[in-house]
Amino acid sequence: MQLLLRDPEYTDRLAAFLRSVGQRPLVREPGQIEVDAPDEELDAYLRVWIVLHPEAHVELQA
């Protein structure tokens, strides 16, 4: 699953958050992260991330 961030400055923060919940994110480039996780699990993590960082827009791409 690809995660695209509107503001690439959040890339490292989101990657660190995903690592903190046991994921292994791969930063492809600023603003783009790849994560191999079940959709439901990733959706739950991103809901928490959005609460913590409401100004950061994240888009999912399959």
For the regions a language model picked out, list residue spans one by one.
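C-terminal basic regulatory modules in eukaryotic proteins
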Residues: 20, 36-62
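Short hydrophobic/aromatic beta-strand micro-patches
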Residues: 4-6, 35-38
